């Protein structure tokens, strides 16, 4: 196509996560280009934290990922043996995912497999979106005098298949997910600022025999004088990955200049893990790199002091880089575009004013800064020599203390967005103390009333750019006519001030923009489904079939009571408003109609024709 709504550069995790979201909307013309001639086959990143797994649930492939992958259940720590400092000794083990921090595991997966899952999702989507391989962005310009396909992008054939031809595409929005050397970032004047650790590291995926006892656990190994190793087992029971600390570099030197090889890496690993050894049978993939921590000062094309809406964005390594040791790179990259995706959908479908897009850089830049700071600290601790107190066992090693402190951060669940018009003030936070405004909606077990299915409430949220309102009924409420839940549902469905009435385009399903669900405190056999208000039993789709899956009750079978687990007020109940990217925007009493109306009036706009903006 010569004109598109969104052009994405790069088919790494960030680019594919964005393309997958946009692929669900047939009326949004999306193009994704990649300079490589095809998808990657092996290597690259592998760690997926619990928050990213929650996102995968929204794409519908979390269960598949859980089945296929290695689960990181605990981390073992090895340090120099005080009796023989040339040898290492296990000094502790830590549970890797804290209890009830997430229902999801921390897993390790081949990045190429992850790409396949996104590509399959896109191929089966309403738009049947597929990448254009072999093309890279070489230049772009923005015409601020028009609102129609403002960005002109020059693409060049990077593989030679098309005789190095160029082509021009005009786009409403461009997103650079094209890595640390991003052409998109350079085109909008963005620069990565940061520092290098002047330290060469190697990474290898290997098939090997070893007498090291913890080879099927994640391990952090610190030797007295030879450096550090990080061991990550991989799916399938045999292959494992080793990150190996190699040579110190001069300030003006790159790791590539050292001409280090896989044999250097294997030799270094054997020196570090003495008295154990590894006998490598096959190196499946390897790479040498130097650690750097860097970040851009903005994630869009709007310079400081400019007052306009952005047209070009960067995400992932294009705007922040860090060491692989914290296992965050791939996760934060996808979380960048999970934040951006629904905002682009809202603007392109006329649901929200384009100013919504300003929030992307603001929200994600803050998180990227925090990531780089934490990674800096972690890298220093990992490379620091052990103290005497740590070696003789009188003090818990700093690396273990820091690891425990970081658990929420490394799980991806520590993100808390600052107050803005997308997050209401916390006046009613006490009604749901465990669902903090600005943080991700923390799922908990429930039972679906229509079929008595035990499940997680958060799993109803799909990557479909819809808002959710979860209404939690008070103690005596069984949704008989006149109850608080009935009153709320009736108001949402019929009142002219209701955001459902105001912002659902004519001719679309009543839950096309805002998806309303309810949770009751009784057991499922005590809840009269037939008495539910019609908004909880809507007729949707082409054939107008009834949706039976919007009513839930607490799980009395022992998996946990959502009211107790998330500090929800049993007497009064409450409603929780959740953004399309699963972050809590508002907590309100069940009769907080005016506040609910005012909140959505500040975010959404009336556009019954669904006209492009």
For each feature predicted by the language model, list its residue ranges.
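N-terminal Rossmann-like FAD-binding beta1-loop-alpha1 element of flavoenzymes
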Residues: 2-33, 37
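Core beta-strand elements of the Rossmann-like FAD/NAD(P) dinucleotide-binding domain
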Residues: 2-4, 161-173, 177, 308
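Conserved mid-domain beta->alpha element of the FAD-binding
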Residues: 11-20, 118, 176, 283, ...
């Amino acid at each position: 196509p010569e004109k598109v709504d969104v052009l994405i550069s790069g088919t790494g995790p960030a680019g594919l996560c964005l393309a997958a979201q946009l692929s669900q909307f047939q009326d949004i013309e999306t193009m994704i280009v990649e300079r490589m001639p095809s998808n990657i086959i092996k290597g690259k990143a592998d760690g997926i934290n619990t928050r990213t797994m929650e996102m995968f649930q929204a794409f519908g492939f979390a269960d598949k990922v859980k089945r296929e992958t290695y689960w990181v259940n605990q981390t073992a720590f090895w340090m120099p043996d005080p009796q023989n400092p040339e040898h290492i000794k296990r000094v502790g083990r830590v549970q890797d995912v804290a209890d009830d921090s997430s229902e999801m595991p921390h897993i390790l997966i081949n990045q190429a497999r992850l790409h396949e899952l996104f590509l399959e999702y896109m191929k089966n989507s309403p738009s049947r979106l597929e990448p254009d391989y072999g093309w890279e962005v070489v230049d772009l310009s923005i015409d601020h005098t028009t609102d129609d396909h403002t960005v002109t992008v020059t693409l060049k054939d990077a593989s030679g298949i098309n005789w190095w031809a160029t082509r021009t595409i005009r786009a409403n929005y461009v997103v650079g997910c094209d890595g640390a050397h991003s052409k998109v970032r350079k085109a909008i004047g963005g620069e990565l600022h940061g520092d290098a650790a002047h330290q060469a590291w190697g990474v290898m995926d290997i098939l090997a025999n070893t007498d090291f006892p913890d080879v099927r656990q994640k391990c952090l190994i610190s030797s007295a004088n030879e450096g550090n190793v990080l061991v990550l087992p991989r799916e399938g029971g045999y292959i494992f990955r080793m990150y190996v600390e190699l040579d110190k570099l001069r300030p003006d030197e790159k790791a590539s200049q050292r001409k280090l090889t896989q044999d250097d890496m294997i030799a270094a690993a054997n020196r570090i893990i003495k008295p154990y050894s590894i006998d490598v049978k096959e190196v499946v993939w390897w790479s040498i790199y130097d650690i750097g921590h860097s970040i851009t000062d903005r994630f869009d094309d709007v310079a400081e002091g400019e007052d306009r809406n952005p047209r070009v964005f960067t995400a992932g390594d294009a705007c922040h880089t860090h060491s692989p040791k914290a296992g965050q790179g791939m996760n934060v990259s996808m979380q960048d575009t999970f934040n951006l995706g629904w905002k682009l959908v809202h603007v392109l479908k006329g649901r929200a004013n384009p100013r919504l897009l300003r929030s992307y850089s603001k929200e994600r830049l803050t998180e990227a800064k925090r990531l780089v700071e934490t990674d800096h600290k972690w890298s220093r601790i990992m490379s620091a020599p052990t103290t005497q107190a740590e070696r003789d066992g009188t003090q818990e090693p700093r690396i273990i203390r820091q690891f425990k402190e970081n658990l929420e951060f490394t799980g991806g669940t520590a993100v808390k967005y600052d107050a803005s018009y997308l997050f209401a003030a916390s006046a009613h936070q006490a009604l749901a103390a465990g669902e903090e405004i600005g943080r991700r909606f923390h799922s908990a077990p429930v039972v679906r009333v229509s079929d008595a299915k035990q499940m997680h409430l958060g799993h109803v949220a799909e990557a479909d750019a819809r808002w959710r309102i979860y209404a939690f009924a008070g103690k005596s409420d069984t949704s008989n006519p006149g109850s608080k839940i009935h009153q709320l549902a009736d108001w949402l469905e019929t009142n002219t001030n209701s955001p459902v009435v105001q912002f659902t385009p004519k001719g679309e399903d009543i839950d096309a923009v805002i998806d309303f669900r309810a949770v009751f405190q009784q057991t499922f056999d005590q809840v009269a489904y037939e008495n539910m208000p019609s908004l909880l039993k809507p007729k949707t789709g082409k054939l107008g079939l009834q949706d039976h899956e919007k009513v839930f009750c607490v799980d009395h079978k022992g998996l946990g009571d959502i009211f107790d687990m998330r500090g929800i007020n049993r007497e009064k109940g409450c409603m929780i408003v959740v953004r399309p990217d699963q972050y809590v925007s508002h907590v309100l009493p069940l009769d907080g109609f005016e506040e609910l109306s005012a909140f959505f009036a500040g975010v959404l706009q009336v556009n019954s024709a669904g006209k492009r903006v």
